[in-house]
């Protein structure tokens, strides 16, 4: 867990982070919890083992895990065991504490005060039972102390407000402590995380909780990680707090920089505390980690899971004439607020009510699903993640590029891309907003504009002032002026770095 920050001043770079993994979800459409969903998700993880990576010790992996909807019966049992009576509004959080326990008291006190300040209460802590024997030497070397925090809130606090307060409390604790070996896997009234650097067939052995007879859920997201050019860390095992991701976000540096550039415009009116928390999106770690941070922030701002995902990972809409004009206006509106987090990427996610999957517009990560007569939906990187009789299958299919699928466990229905798109386009009059408040450059007739005239002497002075070389004038500026395109060429650039150059260089050259 500590590897990444220890290599901060080495040749290792967080930009090496890449993923290519196995993922999936299983949910009961009627929100009926069962141990079958947990057991089958673990079986699915085992069958996706070939999509993950295993260390040479044979026991340490790049990471695998489960993100499950709150197992209410199990949590009441756990709380009762340690003398805690749970009310209607409660939350559990899984926390990777530093291996060195000297700082644990301070960490717990900080959680206590920040949570109390927001009108909630820490009821207690639970040491998560684990079996270290199934860990390899690499996993053991960085094994954190895994604990669960138990939190209560007033009965009249709405669950969405409860989630927001938990989110703010976690961010405040992280900012105050600035402890690199502290990681909150999940802290929610809706979901709980179990993950780590163990091989998939050992996850239920490592976490005995997962085979407890009272451990039942109606929804589970699972993930098997394969990372290249990176060192496995406990906190980078997936699923994260909302999503699990297969692929790469190839635009990650741009996405992070654009977030930093416009972070002051991303304020959430009813969460003023967040103004002091930036950067909320990780500027290092893995691309998936940063994507989860951004999704979490949008959900805290009440965007909803569909709107948030379509903002982050939109389909290819610009040149698609088959798309409804109102839907196109919806996508255009959101494109003005955030650039796509482009893959290839396949993403499974949950907010506790919806379980969903989205493919980016490249569509280079497979996602197939089946719906069975017992009202379970299974979606995964491939078919055959568990055995079933074909006669039990009601519907099956795959996601195409830019598609999104979701199951609503509250209303017991499956929503396909067209259903989700209809919800989005009918939400607001995006076409009217664009017509009234935006201007397209194509509406201007630039030929009617009078060109600026420069005399020769002034033009020469300007070129010297801005450091325009003859090469730039001929090979860059002229093609742009004549053809409206960048000039093409195959020669390398052997120009000395500006700081070492004997010539006066443009200021911009220093930032290339």
Where are these regions (language model features)?
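Conserved short alpha-helical segments that host acidic/polar catalytic motifs at enzyme active sites
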Residues: 1-512
